[in-house]
Amino acid sequence: MGQSHLDIGVGTGYYPAKSLKAGAKCTEITLLDLSPNSLQATEQRILETVGREAVRVNTVVASALEPLPFDKAKKFNSISVFFLLHCMPGTPEEKCKLFDVVRPHLAEDGVLVGTTVLGQGVPINWLGQKMMNSYNNNTKSFHNSEDNKAQFDEGLRRNFEEVDSWIMGQVMLFKARKPRQQDAITNVVPKDNLD
């Protein structure tokens, strides 16, 4: 976690709170999520973990698939996207828009890290498959039946010069550095134009 950090899809705030408690040198953390409740709970968790004097916390209600509501010059030393992509509706190509919108806000020497649960191309036992079907079809808490490593790698490589990704079980972990300077070319079509 860098001095200035952006956490997207904050969930319960477990990861930033754990990093700060372990001694991360972060002095400013920006939390971005669609849920004001998640943002409030995460901010509270962080402040209870390290104290208001240790880190400045900013909260932003916004979509990770739209241009981020920051000045173009705003850069973060690190950006995290933990266990978010598999919860986002849309195709893998549409989800890769996230990499397009975070790239301009990652410092030249910064790092993007993340994880997601894949729906294709990874081994899964019958119980895991049953749970995945339930999460995707019954509870609608997952939207990852088409998600695969190759397409996420492509989206990352389109935006970053250095990409490292690997699989642990059914989870893809990734790390990306050196944001490309030119605008990323994306094949994402806005949902309004799908007819």
From Swiss-Prot:
Keywords per UniProt: Methyltransferase, Transferase
A GO molecular-function annotation: methyltransferase activity
InterPro entries (UniProt xref): Methyltransf_12, SAM-dependent_MTases_sf
Disulphide bonds in the chain: none
Enzyme Commission no: 2.1.1.-
Entry annotated with the keyword Disulfide bond: no
Biological process terms in GO annotation: methylation
Pfam families named in the record: Methyltransf_12
Known pathway: Secondary metabolite biosynthesis
Keyword presence, Mitochondrion: no
Family note: Belongs to the methyltransferase superfamily.
Function: O-methyltransferase; part of the gene cluster that mediates the biosynthesis of pyrophen and campyrone B, which represent a class of fungal amino acid-derived alpha-pyrone natural products. The first step of pyrophen biosynthesis is catalyzed by the PKS-NRPS hybrid synthetase ATPKS that uptakes and condensates L-phenylalanine and malonyl-CoA in order to produce desmethyldesacetylpyrophen.
Name the record gives this protein: O-methyltransferase
